[in-house]
Design a protein with these regions (language model features):
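Short, compositionally biased
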Residues: 1-85, 102-105
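An exposed tryptophan-centered "aromatic clamp" motif
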Residues: 66, 74-87, 93-168
Length: 168
């Protein structure tokens, strides 16, 4: 069930290839797993951090490529230990989109120039509409709830170009 406690965090959905789920997406609890750390502090390319669906590998690539000074957010996620879980990572672009789609905190309009996600389960082939996705039914993720996303852009672990990551 979307928003239900699971694996040290909360179940946010599934990601897959060709409509077949490959893994669950779990978001960490706000109290210990949310950060405003910079994605990257250098204008250099990161070898390998370009997957739209493999946040663990992107995060590992960033950690291997540089120190916490260069990749503060990736190191924060990689080093996180909460509720007995130590396998946290920055979500890849399409993983992050699933989180937004399923855990959208507000009833406000969406940006209608995004939303296509061939890796979501089920896959989404069209952009958002002003009302889709709708506000999540998971109360703790609704505006004012203890786990609600703040109104801001969130970095993904997917590098767009040297020094720039993709955000949702």
């Amino acid at each position: 069930v979307i928003g239900q406690a699971y694996g040290g965090g909360f179940y946010a959905g599934q990601i897959g290839v060709g409509g077949v789920a490959t893994h669950y997406i779990i978001v960490g609890p706000v109290a210990s797993a949310q950060s405003t750390l910079q994605w990257k502090n250098a204008m250099t390319a990161t070898t390998g951090a370009d997957s739209d669906i493999d946040g663990p590998q992107n995060t590992a690539d960033m950690v291997a490529d540089g120190s916490a000074t260069v990749y503060p957010a990736a190191h924060f996620c990689n080093d996180l230990s909460t509720a007995g879980q130590t396998d946290w990572h920055m979500p890849a672009k399409n993983e992050l989109e699933v989180c937004y789609f399923n855990l959208k905190p507000t009833t406000g309009n969406n940006n209608t120039s995004s939303g296509i996600n061939p890796n979501a389960v089920p896959a989404r082939a069209s952009n958002y509409t002003s009302g889709n996705p709708a506000q999540t039914s998971a109360a703790v993720f609704q505006s004012g709830g203890s786990e609600a996303f703040v109104t801001a852009s969130y970095w993904s672990s997917t590098e767009f170009s040297a020094g720039y990551g993709l955000a949702q």
